[in-house]
């Protein structure tokens, strides 16, 4: 392989180096976003830890004083699944694992499953399994806001209170650590009465008013925690994917540079041999 071959390898080395710069930069950005979102998740979880016991106590009191749609549900045969995917790609198997979790949940019950999709990347997956979402939310911030959580909650609650669905479930990737994420389905409505603590409480001025306000606050906070956890999982998966891509680029660069040096050394050796041979012929 002569000069033309060396030039081709040089071009490949340059291309891989440019790709490596991109994957390395994306990995650093994902790391920064993960750190910021993790901090917000920790703060929001503290809020949930405070409000959840209040809701559990209200659940016990509501059960003792009569039925309530938040705990009893309704007669609809349909179930709502809020499926949280990403708006951006290059995050490994993040989206496919979430959709696989959804498929395992609905199985042969597609006719009674209503899907609200969060994130644009999940739409292609849903089309492949012939599911049309009843609602879509795209462009969620890297650190999901309370207003974004409220918008999703309002849609789900409206369908539940109208009797369109008897359950509200959220399918997402739960962030456990930077090296471990778990896809799961969590039911947020109706709320199980078994979650309530023992004993009853006197609620004034009215249980229904207090209950509705407390549930709205709690469930919006719960949905925001899930959105934040999903974003952490997404950024963690992207960080891992970009780190792997960068390492692969490094390995490829090493091989290309070794090949380049071998060819160049071979060309130099050949030139020296030709010079020596020419000198010997003249003698």
From Swiss-Prot:
SUPFAM superfamilies: ATP synthase (F1-ATPase), gamma subunit. It is found in: Cell membrane. GO terms for biological process: proton motive force-driven plasma membrane ATP synthesis. One of its GO terms (cellular component) is plasma membrane. NCBIfam families: ATPsyn_F1gamma (TIGR01146). HAMAP family: ATP_synth_gamma_bact. Belongs to the ATPase gamma chain family. This is ATP synthase gamma chain.
